């Protein structure tokens, strides 16, 4: 179970220590809507594999693997007298054994959370050492000093193959935090973090997803606590991870981006990254009139407090763009695309309706012409689908061409 460098006598002690801290399962937490409204959504089943390489909120879909390792003792409490014992000027002159013993004493010695030792010092790779206790372990490295591993974070670290896995050696002790009113703790490692919360359990974060997570935190848009490990989409090289405040999705061609709230719910209804929207290509961005939009491989999602969340793509997005997007005369979408007569589709916006047919491009119909169009039963009537945008004519009038004729105003 341990490195080949560990003597067989110490390996037995390690097994004893590990057997004492049972692993329990915790379910993912629900997420609060912020800043856009949310409805519950489910996610396709995908395979969980840690991938060290590697955009407002809903509940984590129950179909996801959200197994957590939480341990007997809640790990969201700071270690008593838990000052940093990294390799500083104050303790660098101490031997590894002395630094480990000092760390153990700071934590209450045999009466603390670690309890009594079950081994002596065991050598590890790169000149590091470990000592086992009834309630956990203490690691020592020349670069980072002595740091304890215990509780739910300890169990999650074990699942990642300890220091020989993608996280490497611990670089800090456990630190208590509260995010969004949820109590938890954080411990850092050479190549990532493990975060534990009272609702989501303990999960590692690393790579590109960790980079995006930390950027969001620095911008005051925290995603909260992780509720799953990083999940790899084996089909196309992407990965994602769910949090109490949303999700982060990564793909080599798009980078890592947050998806939250109403936009996340809409995306979930489109089969997530496997649907026509694909992976997110940008962050949620504030725009006209208090709304937001987010771009995806297949189009753009728009949310506004008075209209809700809708998706615009392909030819409709082209026509919408020609008219100035949400800043133009048509405003925000009021519906998704809807199939219509003869293989065509339409989409309703605040300022008019866009139509598309396989035999033509996408065009808007609005105002007085839209009234005439409605009188003739829209695209299902004798006028059929529009073939042009509205065009100014003499004396301030306008006209618009349709499959079945031309309207004038």
Task: Describe each region flagged by the PLM.
Residues 1-28:
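Secretory targeting and sorting signals
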Residues 61-409:
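Extended, compositionally biased repeat/scaffold regions that form elongated interaction surfaces
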């Amino acid at each position: 179970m341990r490195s080949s460098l560990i003597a067989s006598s110490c390996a037995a002690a390690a097994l004893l220590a590990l057997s004492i801290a049972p692993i329990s399962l915790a379910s993912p937490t629900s997420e609060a809507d912020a800043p856009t409204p949310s409805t519950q959504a489910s996610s396709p089943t995908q395979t969980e594999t840690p991938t060290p390489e590697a955009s407002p909120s809903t509940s984590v879909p129950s179909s996801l693997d959200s197994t957590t390792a939480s341990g007997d003792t809640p790990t969201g409490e700071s270690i008593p007298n838990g000052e940093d014992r990294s390799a500083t000027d104050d303790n660098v002159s101490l031997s590894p054994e002395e630094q480990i013993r000092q760390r153990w004493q700071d934590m209450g010695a045999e009466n603390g959370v670690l309890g009594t030792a079950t081994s002596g010092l065991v050598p590890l790779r790169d000149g590091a050492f470990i000592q086992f206790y009834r309630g956990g372990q203490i690691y020592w490295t020349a670069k980072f000093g002595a740091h304890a591993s215990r509780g739910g974070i300890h169990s999650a670290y074990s699942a990642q193959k300890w220091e020989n896995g993608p996280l490497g050696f611990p670089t800090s002790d456990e630190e208590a935090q509260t995010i969004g009113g949820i109590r938890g703790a954080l411990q850092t490692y050479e190549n990532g973090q493990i975060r534990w919360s009272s609702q989501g359990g303990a999960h590692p974060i690393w790579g590109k997803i960790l980079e995006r997570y930390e950027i969001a935190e620095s911008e005051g848009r925290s995603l909260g606590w992780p509720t799953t490990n990083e999940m790899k989409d084996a089909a196309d090289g992407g990965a994602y991870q769910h949090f109490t405040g949303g999700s982060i999705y990564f793909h080599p061609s798009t980078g890592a981006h947050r998806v939250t709230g109403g936009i996340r719910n809409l995306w979930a209804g489109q089969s997530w990254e496997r649907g026509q929207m694909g992976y997110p290509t940008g962050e949620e961005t504030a725009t006209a009139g208090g709304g937001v939009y987010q771009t995806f491989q297949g189009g753009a999602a728009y949310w506004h407090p008075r209209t809700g969340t809708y998706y615009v793509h392909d030819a409709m997005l082209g026509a919408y763009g020609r008219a100035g997007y949400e800043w133009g005369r048509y405003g925000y979408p009021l519906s998704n695309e809807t199939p219509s007569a003869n293989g065509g589709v339409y989409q309703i916006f605040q300022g008019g309706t866009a139509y598309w047919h396989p035999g033509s491009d996408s065009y808007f119909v609005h105002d007085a012409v839209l009234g005439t169009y409605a009188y003739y039963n829209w695209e299902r009537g004798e006028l059929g689908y529009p073939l042009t945008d509205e065009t100014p004519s003499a004396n301030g009038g306008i006209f618009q061409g349709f499959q079945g004729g031309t309207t004038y105003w």
